[in-house]
């Protein structure tokens, strides 16, 4: 019933404008008629659970039925998440303060929960710091995050009285990138997304991992660029794909730093994998998690754990030259 309810909500909330623009984009990229694209989209929704964005970003218009069956689509991803993760425990990941407390062994930085803090607590936290990082309690994808210079606000009362701070729920130390990660882009934490699955025998498996990289002045790496990482060698496997996946932009060289993406050697990959495998056992009721991991000069730390894992990271055309999706994995 929950699955059918989700499907109904998605269809009800579908945007005709976005659907139309997606059909136009698929038409331009494939050369097929808009009517043929629309009818094929409807078939792929019914047969493979593929939404219109899935159809575009995975280039379903270029795939055979056998290839289409290998892709984790939006509805398959949602169904798998609902099966693997007990919703009663997901708040331990979604709420920043609860996550930091439960996973303190892995986070590698101090934080302050403003709902429980006083102005005096904030002033003490900021002592000796040039900058702090601010987050809302439960928003995702970097929405609402700010990096503030401590010298820019007159007193700690800013966090309690200023309208600009109403969304801030936690403040924390600014994460410093490992020098080899900073070379990729130095204005954001370039994090690895590592997906783990905890099986019925309590064994943790790493399904895939990608390196996210900031771009064009952004202070976060969300919606910038990313590429899969080889867990054995620690090297980036392919050119990076735009984080705004429908754009289909591919970056062989980082436009801001001039670094060649494919083949870049990342530090501490084995250590990061070992860390998330350990973290995956902390809340065994949540078995399918996307861990955002930063590599600092002192080693890897966990930024956050995501209970709804993006299904596009490992399946985009520039990263799947064999046109085979995640399901066989």
Question: Over which residues does each language-model region extend?
Answer:
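Active-site nucleotide/adenylate-binding loops and adjacent lid/helix of ATP-dependent enzymes
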Residues: 82-201
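C-terminal active-site "lid" helix and adjoining low-complexity regulatory extension at the edge
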Residues: 249-277, 281-288, 295-329
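Short, solvent-exposed loop/turn segments at secondary-structure junctions
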Residues: 138-141, 176-177, 201, 211-215, ...
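Internal hydrophobic scaffold segments of catalytic domains
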Residues: 1-54, 197-234, 301
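ATP-dependent carboxylate/phosphate-activation module, predominantly the ATP-grasp catalytic core
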Residues: 184-185, 189-272
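Acidic carboxylate-rich catalytic motifs and surrounding loops in phosphoryl-/glycosyl-chemistry enzymes
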Residues: 113-117, 211, 289-292
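Extracellular structured ligand-interaction cores
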Residues: 129-131, 189-193, 206, 288-290, ...
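Conserved N-proximal alpha/beta basic substrate-recognition cap immediately N-terminal to
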Residues: 9-124, 140, 276
